[in-house]
């Protein structure tokens, strides 16, 4: 069995780790970074860029650069959160044929699962380069408050990327694993996870290798991206007041503002003031305009205060669900890049009455925990038991549109629960089971996960048939539902697939696309490498020809020039094989030139040596220092 990797698929950054002996190790990517920006872009010529290369060109290519796509995973196009996102991002969010929110570049649409798969592929390649072996299994983390559709979409992303997802694990739980693996003392901890796009809080009991989640709560649309956008809005407003130009209408300017906002936010975690300086941000009839502004930490904290305060209520709910007070929490572990913000740390301290624990790297701890869980599944990590919970209640719609819970939120998973229902009308021969997830009392106010029909119920007065509905949640938090007529034994079951979501054929097509793209990417890479090698040879040959061309016979010189010309021509194409062949031809032809250079060098060295041999050593006499304090030659 090959290595199973742990991946933190983040909104802003992603990270991959693997068990190395008894320890979990974060793997550096090709750029030498321990985290990879969760950004995918398409260049003018259709080349796909992932991570740092995509981030570097975002300012000049905003409409084809996808960031924070995790916030769209498993969401419908008409979701209020998607409406909010559409106004803030420079790329197009479009309605897919199944009603989901997808993204578009150059007329080509991509599902959020597909974009996530491009990032997962990068993580997979990073691990393979480090391990020197193929990797096809992973544990992937998701926000604890992700619903079933979002978890399923994440699993789909893994499949598209060529990974078998052995387990979907909640981010705070993964962080707790990393924090508590070497702790011998039992205790209760809170994991406060404020990342790039989501907020989660989980309460766990840790002891004797058992990690038991008591409760979880959160907000899947609250994170660093919102802090950035709040600052972008402020900068745009201030610039409009000063210059009368609305930068929101200029996608390129907006992307520059976003980059500057993120940089300023990070700087203000370690300094009390920063300067935002964006020359030539736009122009009007009077000429170019520059944006220069000083921003204090106090001003930034005032701008985002309500966002920080929004994290308090989920913490209180999680404590209440766990049956605990803040004083009973032994340690608060901070996870996610946003927890570096002093204001966030201050709010956590006020809420829990203690200094938060800062001994873990907030950007890496989730991936480390995922790798530990991978180690548990592989049998490399012993005596660790992880008991997670379902974040939201699950149930069905019953008479009058009421939401009847079958599995309450914060129930330990995996779990299976049944409840008996009946018909609402006389002689009813079929029932439709509509499955929902959420905490509202009316079904319509919750998230519909799917529906199915149980047919062939024998005629009977209403209330007589016994229909047993069973919910089964696996360790990934993914739901299966069945309905059985107890009188006839007839049963209908479905693995919940959101009313949107990707069908098996969609996933298969995307897997094939990914494989085809992998081959295309390899071909493109080979062409680039061949061109680089050819360019270097052309340059060195031209230089050598200019300096030493007179030392080779005319036919040989002509052969070199012809080979040079052919190679230059081949560089106009992307055919790696042709370029390699022409490179070899030039290398062979220019061997005579190399021989001439070496011959000349050898002759030059011999002449220098001979000249050295002709030097006559001078005689000298040593004079007694006492008499004459010097030497004469």
Curated annotation (Swiss-Prot):
Pfam family, one: HSP70
Induction description: By stress conditions e.g. heat shock.
Protein origin, superkingdom: Bacteria
Claim: Chaperone is one of the keywords in the record: yes
PANTHER family xref list: HEAT SHOCK PROTEIN 70KDA
The protein's role, per its UniProt record: Acts as a chaperone.
Protein name per UniProt: Chaperone protein DnaK
Species this protein is from: Rhodopseudomonas palustris (strain HaA2)
């Amino acid at each position: 069995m090959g290595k199973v990797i742990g991946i933190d698929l983040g909104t802003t950054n992603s990270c991959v780790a693997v068990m190395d002996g008894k320890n979990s190790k974060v793997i550096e990517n090709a750029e030498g970074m321990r985290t990879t920006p969760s950004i995918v872009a398409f260049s003018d010529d259709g080349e796909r860029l992932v991570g740092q290369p995509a981030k570097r060109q975002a300012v000049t290519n905003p409409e084809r650069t996808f960031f924070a796509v995790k916030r769209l995973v498993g969401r419908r196009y008409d979701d209020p959160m998607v409406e909010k996102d559409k106004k803030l991002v420079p790329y197009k969010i479009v309605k897919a044929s199944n009603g989901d929110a997808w993204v578009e570049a150059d007329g080509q649409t991509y599902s959020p699962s597909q974009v996530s798969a491009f990032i997962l592929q990068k993580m997979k390649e990073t691990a393979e380069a480090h391990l020197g072996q193929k990797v096809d299994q992973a544990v992937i983390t998701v926000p604890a408050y992700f619903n079933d559709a979002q978890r399923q979409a994440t699993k789909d992303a893994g499949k598209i990327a060529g990974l078998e997802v052995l387990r979907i694990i909640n981010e705070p739980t993964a962080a707790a694993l990393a924090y508590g693996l070497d702790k011998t003392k039992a205790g209760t901890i809170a994991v406060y996870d404020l990342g790039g796009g989501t907020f989660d809080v989980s309460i766990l009991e840790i002891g004797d290798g058992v990690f038991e989640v008591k409760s979880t709560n959160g907000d899947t649309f609250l994170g660093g991206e919102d802090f950035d956008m709040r600052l972008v809005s402020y900068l745009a407003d201030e610039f409009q007041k000063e210059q009368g130009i609305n930068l929101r209408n200029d996608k390129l300017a907006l992307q520059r503002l976003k980059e500057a906002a993120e940089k300023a936010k990070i700087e203000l975690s370690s300094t009390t003031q920063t300067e935002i300086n964006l020359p030539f941000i736009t122009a009007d009839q009077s000429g170019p305009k520059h944006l220069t502004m000083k921003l204090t930490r106090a001003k930034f904290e005032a701008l985002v205060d309500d966002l920080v305060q929004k994290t308090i209520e989920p913490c209180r709910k999680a404590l209440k669900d766990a049956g605990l007070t803040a004083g009973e929490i032994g340690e608060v572990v901070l996870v996610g890049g946003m927890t570096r913000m002093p204001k966030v740390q201050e709010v956590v301290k006020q809420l829990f009455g203690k200094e938060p624990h800062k001994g873990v790297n907030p950007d890496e701890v989730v991936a480390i925990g995922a790798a530990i869980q991978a180690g548990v599944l592989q049998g490399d990590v012993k005596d660790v038991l992880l008991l997670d919970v379902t974040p939201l209640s699950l149930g069905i719609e019953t008479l009058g549109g009421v939401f009847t819970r079958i599995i309450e939120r914060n129930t330990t998973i995996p779990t299976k629960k049944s409840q008996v229902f009946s018909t609402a009308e006389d002689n009813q021969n079929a029932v439709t089971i509509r499955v929902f997830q959420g905490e509202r009392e009316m079904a319509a106010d919750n998230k519909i996960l799917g529906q199915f029909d149980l047919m062939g119920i024998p005629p009977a007065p209403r209330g007589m048939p016994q229909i047993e509905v069973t919910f089964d949640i696996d360790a990934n938090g993914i739901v299966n539902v069945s309905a059985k007529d107890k009188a006839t034994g007839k049963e209908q079951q479905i693995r919940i697939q959101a009313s949107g979501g990707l069908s098996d054929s969609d996933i298969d097509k995307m897997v094939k696309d990914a494989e085809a793209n992998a081959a295309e990417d390899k071909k493109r890479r080979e062409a680039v490498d061949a061109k680089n090698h050819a360019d270097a040879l052309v340059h060195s040959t031209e230089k050598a020809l200019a300096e030493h061309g007179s030392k080779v016979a005319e036919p040989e010189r002509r052969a070199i020039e012809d080979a040079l010309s052919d190679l230059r021509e081949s560089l106009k194409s992307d055919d790696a094989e042709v370029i390699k062949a022409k490179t070899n031809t030039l290398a062979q032809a220019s061997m005579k030139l190399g021989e001439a250079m070496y011959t000349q060098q050898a002759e030059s060295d011999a002449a220098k040596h001979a000249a050295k041999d002709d030097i006559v050593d001078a005689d000298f006499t040593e004079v007694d220092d006492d008499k004459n304090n010097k030497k004469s030659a």
